[in-house]
Amino acid sequence: MQPSTNIFSLHGCPPSYLSHIPTSSPFCGQNPNPFFSFETGVNTSQFMSLISSNNSTSDEAEENHKEIINERKQKRKISNRESARRSRMRKQRQVDELWSQVMWLRDENHQLLRKLNCVLESQEKVIEENVQLKEETTELKQMISDMQLQNQSPFSCIRDDDDVV
């Protein structure tokens, strides 16, 4: 970037803000800039070569700066690609682990279902046996009740001949 310069100071014309200075000054016909006659010890050709060398130096610096920026962009691009690759690999590992868990859980679920079916079958058998035992209990209670009634009847001392031992 080159600094902006006032074009009036380059051509010897006073800027508009100096319009209050009379034109009949001792500088009439000369450059009113007090630094115009300042001797630098550098002639015009040296000054121009210095400017052009500064321009080429600034052009080289700008080129170097652009190269550095491009190198950084390339490195960042490569780094981003590598980071994206690592991220994809990490996600793939997570997906693989999740699938492994799914398979393990499915197997576990099947085993639990088999056990549940066995328990349900056992429960049915126990329920059937329980019903059968209740029926037997009811029958036995009825028999006991009948026997007690027979023992309490007034004719309990008379027995059939079949009952005698």
From Swiss-Prot:
Keywords: DNA-binding, Nucleus, Transcription, Transcription regulation
Region spans: Basic motif: 72-93
Cited CDD domains: bZIP_plant_GBF1
Domain of life: Eukaryota
Positions of the UniProt region annotated as Leucine-zipper: 98-112
Main location group: nucleus
A GO-annotated cellular component: nucleus
Pfam families: bZIP_1
All copies of domain bZIP, residue ranges: 70-133
GO molecular function: DNA binding; DNA-binding transcription factor activity
Subcellular localization: Nucleus
Annotated InterPro entries: AtbZIP8/43, bZIP, bZIP_plant_GBF1, bZIP_sf
Function: Probable transcription factor involved in somatic embryogenesis. Acts as a positive regulator of BHLH109.
Self-association state and partner proteins as the record states: Forms heterodimers with BZIP34 and BZIP61.
PANTHER family linked to this entry: BASIC LEUCINE ZIPPER 43-RELATED
Protein name in the entry: Basic leucine zipper 43
Organism (species): Arabidopsis thaliana
Name of the encoding gene: BZIP43
